[in-house]
Amino acid sequence: MVNTERFIQQAVSEIRELTADARVVMALSGGVDSSVCAALAAQAIGERLEPIYVDTGLMRKGETDRIRHLFGHLNLRIVDASDEFLDALAGVADPETKRKIIGERFIRVFEREAEKTGATVLLQGTIYPDRIESEGGIKSHHNVGGMPLGIAFTQVLEPLRDLYKDEVREVAGALGLPREIQHRMPFPGPGLAVRIIGEVTREKVAVIREANAITEEELVEEFRPWQCLAALVGLGTGVKGDIRLHGWIVAVRAVNSRDGMTADPLEVPYPVLFKIASRITAEIPSVARVVYDVTPKPPATIEYE
């Protein structure tokens, strides 16, 4: 349990003191972590904050428009770097290599924007579970293990580095952020890339973006999972009409958790699972099969890569 009032005071003071008169680039994704960072930084340094949203081409359906609507008042800069990210991932199948590539590209985009604004400090929404998983070798996070050496920023600030996800939500409430942001499901920094087993292609991204949207539509409002997602896990044989199809296999996953360190699979009623499978296979012609993942964390991680 975090003392939100004390934390906010300390975080605002820390950001103000460490940045001095420098301009600060804010990595704003629209999730609760980066949104809390933005609110803290806005209190601390006002117009010296340069909030930037990078469209990596690996975002959820409608995400960029949503970000523009929610955060346009913060002098938000939207950078479309989708081709840059997807081209860099071409031919890469190893999950750690994908994460490293996304992390490096992510930082390079911010370096470019910093040069335009004069910003020398990078602010990130890294939370405690991110650091534990990176330091423990479980998997790297795009804003921790993926950061390349020789970074051009003089400082990288992570004011949420010691908080768990539920504590970040408490701080969001204390800051008066909208409930939509407070209770936003976690979304991985590398985006849909970690929901695609193997090489990331534009076709696969389009498939899994739509499958994720369907999964969220069917589960979020009724069941309030801590996180739910769809992942592209391989190819399988199916039949549509009289035609034999070698199409994608989509795995649906929904879990409950307190802090992301452990998680239990959500017991979704069979009729709901059947509806999700029916919608995904009907609305995405290239999908041949849908399965539901009931593995807890541990031994599995919540995301697939």
Curated annotation (Swiss-Prot):
Q: What is its EC number?
A: 6.3.5.2
The kind of enzyme this is, by top-level EC class, is ligase
Which CDD domains would you find in this protein's record?
GMP_synthase_C
> Which keywords are on file for this protein?
ATP-binding, GMP biosynthesis, Ligase, Nucleotide-binding, Purine biosynthesis
Gene3D superfamilies on file: 3.30.300.10, HUPs
Chain sites annotated for binding ATP = S29, G30, G31, V32, D33, S34, S35
- Which transformation does this protein catalyse, written as a reaction? XMP + L-glutamine + ATP + H2O = GMP + L-glutamate + AMP + diphosphate + 2 H(+)
- One Pfam family, short name: Asn_synthase
Q: In which pathway does it act?
A: Purine metabolism; GMP biosynthesis; GMP from XMP (L-Gln route): step 1/1
Q: Which ranges carry the GMPS ATP-PPase domain? A: 2-184
* GO MF assignments: asparagine synthase (glutamine-hydrolyzing) activity; ATP binding; GMP synthase activity
**Subunit composition and interactions:** Heterodimer composed of a glutamine amidotransferase subunit (A) and a GMP-binding subunit (B).
The protein, known as: GMP synthase [glutamine-hydrolyzing] subunit B
Q: Which gene encodes it?
A: guaAB
